[in-house]
Amino acid sequence: RQMSRVGIVTDSAADLRPAVARELDITVVPSRIQIGDRIWMDGPDLRTPSFYRRAFASSETPRVLPPTSQQFVDAYAHLAQVSDAIVSVHMTSALDGTVRAARRARSLLGQRCDVHVLDSRFASVALGMLVTEAAKAAQGGAAASEIERLLRGLIPHTYCAFFVDSSERLERAGITVEGCSGEKWDTQ
């Protein structure tokens, strides 16, 4: 059997270190951060102490915007040149429109490449762990359908908790989920 090349894509909500993304050949499509009228691309270069000071000192609430469909089209088209298929794993659709943008990009790309878009149901470290497992499977020669099956098996057994001092900033940024105020948060 000829080994196929599967490209792995995620978004910056996976919080992957750049060295890990490079080592595992993961394409990270950046979210966008909006404060007032300015928009920045998310990523390690943006996440500096001076940016955080500016963001939290601003009277405007920072908003995280999902990547655009065009950002995904560009990433998929680039990977399609060297891949037989793409597995694109993203932040939970309960929090933002990243999965929707990725699915739209898949339809805009048409038949140029087989793209599998998965809603991880998570963000941050849990998403990063799932993406890392997908990349390791791809490097091991797994087909896209095998990687998708692996992730669908891992998702129900993955758990994530996070804590904030106050949900006020989350609510102002528009990332509130019903039942998230101090209770167990289950997006399934």
Q: Where are the model-predicted features located?
A:
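Mixed-charge interfacial surface used for oligomerization/domain docking
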Residues: 5, 13-27, 31-32, 94-116, ...
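Hydrophobic residues in alpha-helical segments
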Residues: 55-56, 80, 138, 171
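Glycine-rich phosphate- or other oxyanion-binding loops that anchor nucleotides, phosphorylated ligands
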Residues: 57-95, 100-104, 148, 156, ...
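Residues that mark the start of a beta-strand
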Residues: 5-7, 85
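Aromatic side chains
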Residues: 40, 51-52, 72, 76, ...
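Short, Lys/Arg-enriched N-terminal segments with co-localized hydrophobic residues
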Residues: 1-2
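Glycine/charged-rich beta-loop-alpha catalytic/anionic-binding loops adjacent to active sites
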Residues: 54-57, 83-88, 108-119
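N-terminal glycine-rich anion-binding loop in soluble enzyme alpha/beta folds
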Residues: 7-71
